Amino acid sequence: LYGDGNALVNLNVEQDIKKYIALSETNFSVSKDGGTVEVLVTGYGGDAKLYASPDYKSYGYLNMQWAKVTKGLLQAKLQITLDANQYSEERTAGIICYFLDDDDQLIAESDYIEVKQAGQGALTSTDMSRDGEVKKLQSHTKGNVGLPIVIMGDGFVDKQIASGYYDECMQIGLDNFFSEEPFKSLREYFDVWQVTTVSETNIMDGEHNTAINSYPTGEGTLITGDYQKVFGYGSNISELMESGLFPETTFLVMMNTDTYAGTCYFGFGNESGIVNLAVGYAPLIFSP
């Protein structure tokens, strides 16, 4: 450009490249037996790092792996693998991709990826012989008397018990319970028993019969169940009954569903007043 004095003026114009992430597809379906889907991820994040994260409910059964990642103008493939779905109902895994800079500041993020997985549907039991089986999972090593916990499941059919799935779920539920304080630091003070419950069906809707008839009501996080059946299964534990500590027992019921809900009932009492007896119902957020 020339001004009035014929002087040459230089103009430097810089344009930043927009940071973005685009996906080849955002909706997928996987069979109940599990499988892998692949998403082509393109975009630009400069020197930022690329990440992918599932929603909180998907951590237990979803694995992700990046393949063929190029820097600069990004081109990458995200492989998403789902384990077999042991629940009766369909479930949906959610994933999002994003760029973070060196200060962990969000630079860009993708649309939401949804992977729907079919459920097992209705299963029924034909062999009820293991219903009520008892085994001790842990004996206290501190304190004069162990604090009693009884863990059992609901909505598990005979095949899921025979395969070892029931035992795995009970162990995961127990480990999750003892992952929180103050129970984590006090675990050595507890005695823990497991009771096997065989349900007629895995459908937990209040209309089908399960061992404890627990089910999410659909009203917020409320779960209902037949605590008298819980106590009935607990009465199979001769050591617990002979100790006189049944009124001090915490019962944990692990439900064969990943529905987001959870309820604890407190305030049971006897002729002497309030006791420490409690029943807690919880879904299997993290299953094998």
Language model region names:
Residues 5-16, 106-120:
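C-terminal edge beta-strand
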Residues 20-23, 45-79:
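Surface-exposed binding patches on compact interaction domains or structured appendages
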Residues 160-169, 269-287:
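Short pre-active-site segment immediately N-terminal to the catalytic Zn-binding motif
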Residues 33-39, 76, 86-95:
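Short, solvent-exposed loop/turn segments enriched in Ser/Thr/Gly
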Residues 121-246:
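Propeptide-to-catalytic entry region of secreted or membrane-anchored zinc metalloproteases
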Residues 18-41:
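Beta-sheet-dominated interaction scaffolds and their linkers
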Residues 1-4, 78, 89-101:
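A short beta-strand micro-motif common to beta-rich folds, especially ectodomain repeats
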Residues 203-204, 234-248, 255-274:
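Catalytic zinc-binding patch centered on the HExxH motif and its immediate surroundings
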